[in-house]
C-alpha cells in the first residue's frame, strides 16, 4: 500500500539545531507543519557504548514523495550528528481538510 502523507521524526541535540531544521523544512516547502517536543530523553548505543542524552524531537507533517530524495538529504546537510534519526511513518487516516492542507503547503 502506498501512502500519500507521512510523519517524519527527527531528533536534534538542542532547541537551536531543531529550530534550524524546522526553518529550513518550512522555507523549502518540505513540511506543512513541524512540532518540536522538548526535552525528550534518548537512550541509545553508539560505537559499542550506551548513552543517555536529552534531545528535542521534531514531528514533521509532509508528503511521502518528498522523503527520500529531498527531506533526508536536506536534514543531513545541516544536522550535526553522523547518523541522525530521520524516520517516517505513514499517516493512515486523518481529517481530509488537514491532509489536503499538508498537500497544498508542500506543493511547489
Q: PLM features: what roles do these ranges have?
A:
Residues 1-108:
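Positively charged, small/polar-rich N-terminal and surface patches that mediate targeting and assembly
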Amino acid at each position: 500500500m502506498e501512502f500519500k502523507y507521512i510523519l517524519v521524526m527527527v531528533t536534534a541535540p538542542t532547541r537551536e539545531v531543531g529550530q534550524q531544521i524546522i526553518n529550513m523544512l518550512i522555507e523549502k516547502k518540505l513540511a506543512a507543519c513541524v512540532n518540536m517536543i522538548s526535552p525528550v530523553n534518548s537512550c541509545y548505543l553508539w560505537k559499542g557504548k550506551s548513552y543517555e542524552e536529552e534531545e528535542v524531537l521534531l514531528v514533521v507533517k509532509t508528503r511521502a514523495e518528498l522523503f527520500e530524495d529531498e527531506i533526508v538529504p536536506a536534514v543531513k546537510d545541516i544536522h550535526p550528528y553522523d547518523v541522525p534519526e530521520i524516520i517516517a511513518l505513514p499517516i493512515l487516516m486523518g481529517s481530509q481538510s488537514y491532509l489536503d492542507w499538508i498537500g497544498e503547503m508542500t506543493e511547489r
